[in-house]
């Protein structure tokens, strides 16, 4: 049941993004200061700032979009997508970042495009609401 702090799908997107960026902060700290002794921390920080932070934000947006669909459309399958899609994107990022620059760039571009698509879908549904109190997606 929706609460006053979570009464529309965009709330799920905002909360998902904030949570994912909090996780990214912790993960980036670990990578920069703990894991790599042989690479200068500034190099790791720059690469992670340009790739990992947008990836985590994208995963949070994807998770939030599907969570919003689950809550406000009563879509049972969306809750699984809210978990599986970010897991897939993060796992693919982890694998491709060290495997192939070309494949990584294609994957990274696809991730960003897919994120913009989902975000736009939620924004359009928000704009199509008849009144502010309406909670369901159209």
Where are these regions (language model features)?
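Hydrophobic alpha-helical segments at protein termini of multi-pass membrane proteins
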Residues: 1-138
